[in-house]
């Protein structure tokens, strides 16, 4: 196998150690890295602020937009609208991913921020069902579609952006800040809803109080847009783009993406499945499960979830450090095993009716989730090569979230209603854990290694020189995968 040119159309950079030169090693700009992490995490926080608010207001939203004599039916209708946004996420990934691979990660992430803020802000302006009838849920549905389309390019782009800006040694730590933003967004959303429940009467919440969290998205979006517009493009993309422009006709199209990288796409979908089923089960579905299924006071359930997330935030950063030191595989495999062993006991604790035992059950699930949230943002981008990273990650991530993660609240609520078994969420988590364990059989350890398709990334010139003198690998794979027969021009033309 020969070394590739500096920017192979399908695989990006690939060289063997004996041909590597010190000036080819990326030296990361630390101040720019911090700004990149902050801007990416803020965008993710805003996305999950909205999802958290919607999940914690599901009962209220059901009453405002879906009048019914059955409270459970209202919650299911609200979660159905919540789920619709996930159905359009793959379309967003299909559009924004190739754009990010061709024109740059920074430009696309700025645009997704605008759309996300507009979609969330507009929800706060929609009149209730009693005022405009059927148009209320229709407008809510349209706003959720805008949100879903924009978020289709958000996580894949943000994870790619942080991964490509980070050094190889601390990519896990830097990536963990992305999910720190997720938890921060959830806490901000849940905290706002909880404060509103405590300060306002039920009538005030139904009348206007529920609108406040959505209207906050406007100024948050402007702040996020400003931060992202001040960023530079990632070093990995700049290095590839300069050479790729000389061979425009060689850019891999979507057909080649699925043919060459199909296995990694499936692996990514499996990892995202177990990650997001756990995420949405705990952070989005549990508040409604506690109040509707278990008859627990709504404000108390929200408060317990907030406390769990507050504990998870610093642990997420610690988990990022561990993923760099111990590896991504031990973290993810350990979390899957924990779900298999603890899911049923945790749900029994949650259903006990005792505040302390409920918190213990939720916290144990939160600890398993931390192992995912701290390691996935560095694991998923490392599955793919630089020329297709944004496209592949966005498509695989959003298809998996749409089919499995985002549907978790709706499917679980429906199954609990149909079966009458309060342990259904535990069985659901155990099934996801099995899929996660099987998927990990096909995942290589990437901690401390360069991203596929990118040269090694270090913190200073001294580290670059030391890398050349060491025996440390400079690529994840010893060889590149073989290219299929791409005689069909549709397979080699640009994706967009």
Give the positions of each predicted feature.
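C-terminal ends and interior cores of transmembrane alpha-helices
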Residues: 67, 114-133, 337-353
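Extracytoplasmic gate region of multi-pass secondary transporters
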Residues: 55, 262-312, 405-409
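Extracellular/periplasmic helix-loop-helix junction of adjacent transmembrane segments
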Residues: 58-91, 138
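Helix-to-loop junctions at the C-terminal end of transmembrane segments
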Residues: 93-105, 316-328
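C-terminal transmembrane helical hairpin of 12-TM major facilitator-type secondary transporters
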Residues: 329-376
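Glycine-rich segments within core transmembrane alpha-helices of 12-TM secondary carriers
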Residues: 173-197, 220, 394-408
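Hydrophobic core of transmembrane alpha-helices in multi-pass small-molecule transporters
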Residues: 132-152, 356-371
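Cytoplasmic membrane-interface "Motif A"-like loop-to-helix N-cap segments
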Residues: 102-114, 325-337
């Amino acid at each position: 196998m020969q070394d590739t040119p500096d920017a192979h159309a399908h695989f990006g950079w690939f060289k063997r150690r004996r041909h590597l030169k010190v000036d080819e090693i990326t030296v990361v700009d630390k101040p720019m890295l911090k700004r990149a992490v902050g801007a990416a995490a803020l965008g993710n926080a805003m996305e999950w602020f909205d999802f958290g608010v919607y999940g914690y207001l599901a009962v209220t939203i059901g009453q405002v937009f879906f009048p019914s004599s059955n409270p459970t039916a209202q919650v299911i209708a609200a979660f159905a609208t919540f789920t619709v946004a996930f159905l359009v996420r793959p379309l967003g990934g299909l559009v924004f991913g190739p754009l990010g691979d061709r024109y740059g990660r920074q430009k696309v992430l700025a645009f997704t921020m605008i759309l996300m803020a507009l979609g969330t802000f507009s929800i706060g302006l929609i009149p209730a069902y009693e005022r405009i009838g059927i148009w209320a849920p229709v407008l809510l549905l349209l706003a959720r579609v805008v949100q879903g389309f924009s978020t289709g390019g958000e996580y894949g782009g943000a994870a790619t952006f942080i991964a490509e800006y980070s050094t190889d040694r601390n990519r896990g730590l830097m990536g963990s800040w992305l999910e720190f933003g997720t938890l921060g967004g959830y806490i901000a959303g849940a905290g706002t809803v909880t404060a509103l429940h405590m300060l306002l009467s039920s009538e005030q919440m139904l009348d206007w109080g529920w609108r406040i969290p959505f209207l906050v998205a406007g100024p948050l979006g402007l702040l996020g847009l400003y931060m992202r517009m001040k960023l530079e493009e990632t070093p990995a993309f700049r290095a590839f783009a300069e050479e790729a422009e000389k061979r425009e006709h060689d850019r891999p199209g979507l057909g080649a993406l699925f043919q060459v990288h199909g296995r990694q796409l499936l692996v990514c979908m499996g990892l995202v499945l177990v990650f997001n089923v756990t995420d949405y089960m705990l952070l989005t579905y549990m508040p409604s499960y506690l109040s509707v299924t278990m008859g627990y006071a709504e404000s108390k359930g929200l408060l317990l979830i907030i406390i769990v997330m507050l504990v998870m935030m610093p642990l997420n950063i610690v988990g990022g450090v561990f993923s760099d030191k111990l590896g991504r595989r031990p973290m993810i495999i350990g979390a899957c095993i924990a779900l298999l062993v603890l899911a049923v006991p945790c749900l029994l604790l949650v259903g006990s009716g005792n505040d302390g035992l409920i918190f213990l059950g939720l916290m144990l699930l939160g600890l398993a989730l931390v192992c995912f949230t701290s390691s996935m943002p560095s694991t998923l981008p490392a599955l793919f090569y630089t020329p297709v990273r944004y496209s592949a990650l966005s498509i695989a991530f959003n298809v998996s979230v749409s089919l499995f993660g985002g549907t978790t609240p709706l499917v679980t609520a429906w199954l609990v209603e149909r079966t009458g078994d309060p342990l259904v969420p535990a069985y659901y988590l155990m099934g996801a854990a099995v899929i996660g364990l099987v998927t990990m059989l096909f995942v290589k350890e990437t901690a401390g290694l360069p991203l596929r398709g990118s040269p090694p990334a270090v913190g200073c010139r001294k580290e670059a020189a030391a890398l050349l003198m060491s025996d440390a690998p400079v690529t994840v794979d010893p060889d590149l995968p073989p290219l299929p027969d791409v005689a069909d021009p549709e397979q080699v033309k640009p994706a967009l």
